[in-house]
A protein has these predicted regions:
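Conserved active-site and cofactor/substrate-binding residues in soluble primary-metabolism enzymes
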Residues: 16-17, 37, 142, 146, ...
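Active-site proximal loops enriched in glycine and acidic residues that flank catalytic Cys/His/Asp
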Residues: 34, 155, 185-189
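A glycine-rich phosphate-binding loop feature that marks nucleotide/adenosyl-phosphate handling sites
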Residues: 68-76, 167-176
Length: 190
């Protein structure tokens, strides 16, 4: 869900454009897309930080300073932490304006984001919200076939989480949508 809310996004519940969830949350880093490579690289960087600390742990402040991991977003208020090749999106203030210009800015932002989804040619994206910047690193590279095959060969149970065994308010258990995809084949990810 964070992937869909990493930049300014339309919120159906409030019927407004909301700012990045990373700016509203207490998270240090947001990971988006297919995260296998990203999480391994991020874990290695955290492990390296922890190795040099007195207590063997990485602090939240140290983790929040990690940069350059594909498939992640971070926030900063320092312009010098923005990659030099970054593309600036229209700001949150522009895209959230409830005007014709605001809607055009939102559409422009979407087009820029959509044209930067290729892991080979994508550039970092930056969205300003007041004095802070959301920086989106380029997407993670796809897994090589051997690694992808290992992921697909994991012992998935095709079962819902045990918490859904408890009857809901309507007396039913399970996840009805699971029936539709129970015997589906993976043709793409994302």
């Amino acid at each position: 869900e964070a992937s869909l809310r990493r930049t300014s996004h339309y919120d159906y519940w409030s019927n407004t454009v909301r700012r990045s969830i990373l700016l509203d949350s207490k998270a240090d880093i947001l990971m988006y897309g297919m995260g296998e490579n990203s999480i391994l690289e991020l874990a290695a960087k955290i492990k390296e930080i922890a190795k040099h600390s007195e207590d063997g742990f990485a602090t939240s402040k140290e983790v929040a300073k990690i940069r350059g991991v594909r498939g992640t977003c971070y926030r900063t208020s320092k312009k010098e932490e923005i990659p030099s090749d970054a593309i600036f999106l229209p700001s949150y203030q522009e895209v959230s304006a409830n005007t014709k210009e605001g809607k055009i800015a939102f559409a422009k932002s979407y087009i820029i984001q959509e044209s930067n989804t290729d892991s080979i040619s994508a550039k970092p994206l930056v969205e300003q919200t007041e004095e802070r910047f959301l920086v989106q690193e380029p997407p993670s590279h796809p897994l090589p076939q051997e690694q992808y095959d290992k992921v697909m060969e994991l012992p998935y149970t095709r079962r819902w989480h045990p918490m859904y065994d408890k009857p809901a308010a309507n007396g039913k258990t399970g996840v009805p949508a699971l029936e539709e995809v129970l015997f589906s084949l993976t043709s793409c990810r994302g």
